[in-house]
Amino acid sequence: MRFLTTPWARGRRAAAADRRRASPTVTVAVCTLDRRDQLERTLHALRSLTYTAFEVVVVNGPSTDGTAEMLEGFDHSLRVATCGVAAIGASRNIAVASAAGDLVAFIDDDAIPPPNWLETLLPAFDDPLVGAAGGAVFDVPLGRVDWQLCTCTRLGAGNTDSPGPISRYLGAGADPVAYLAGCNMMIRRSALQQVDGFNPLLTGAYDDVDICCRLNDAGWGIAYVPAAVVRHDRAPNLTRDDQQTIRDPYRILASRAIFAMQSTVAPDETAVVAMLAESLREWTVFADQQLAAGHLTPDEHQRFVEQAEAGARDGLAAGRGPRLVTVIPDPPRHLFRPYR
């Protein structure tokens, strides 16, 4: 992890400018991939937000389901960017670079916020040292709040209902470290600029853990606001099916390996390898259970195990390299377009 004097100073100056604004501007960022109908519902829900100083930026991945056409014909003011790869880290960086607001609020394309969502999160930023704030997530398929005070070890073992207070999980090198759910987090743009944005190697998981980890290690505070609850449908994606069952663990294991290798200055590769071996055993047991229950065919079972092994192998190799640096430009404030 690298910290340069210039980005640090620039980040602090920008944070000071944020504080001078009575009503900070917010960019609501929605990264999407092949979820045309869910995205359209989310965009309509954002019209009900009661905070007025916000814009919406949609980053469309390589969708093939008519998402681009829907966005072209959408009858409300929003800005659209594209991401040529199916990778959440890269997509979030495009959203941040496009954001004209002082703060960037991330919500998933299959999530619905309450009308007071932004107002509930904003007071956390009255503290100039807070770099990120987020709330709880109501898991619609489970029918309950499932993401509350989230923490994760530097080896990628997560807990979405950790005992408080959050201060137990903050401070340089904290392990486990507090993080915010990626579908319900607001981050100071200047802080994102300082830490070089999201890790583009993280294609489908641990992007939220990684950004909070690096913000924490850079000295920024992280606030958990339990009253800010977002409803999350957890629609099918490249990893899970419509029954919420993991069908391809590649991205999970690859992203976990990358995070574990790059979450500290001097990673313990022996510990990472041991963690991956145990994780592979657990995923193999899961695949065996799915096969026995008739949810996987023998061919699907074989592919599942092969994908798990490939994810661990490829993630470890990628994690050994340097973290890719994304230079976040200054905000294009002239492009700010209030969402109506």
List each language-model region with its residue ranges.
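Glycine-rich, basic loop-to-helix element that forms the pyrophosphate-binding segment
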Residues: 82-99, 171
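N-proximal low-complexity "stem/linker" segments adjacent to membrane-targeting elements
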Residues: 1-47, 340
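Short aromatic/hydrophobic "clamp" motif used to bind/position activated sugar donors
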Residues: 104
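Conserved donor NDP-sugar-binding/catalytic core segment of glycosyltransferases
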Residues: 115-153
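A conserved acidic beta->alpha catalytic loop
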Residues: 45, 52, 60-69, 111-112
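A short, conserved alpha-helix in the catalytic core of glycosyltransferases
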Residues: 179, 183-196, 201-229
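Short, flexible, basic/aromatic active-site loop/helix in glycosyltransferases
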Residues: 153-177
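Non-catalytic, C-terminal membrane-associated alpha-helical segments of glycosyltransferases
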Residues: 268-340
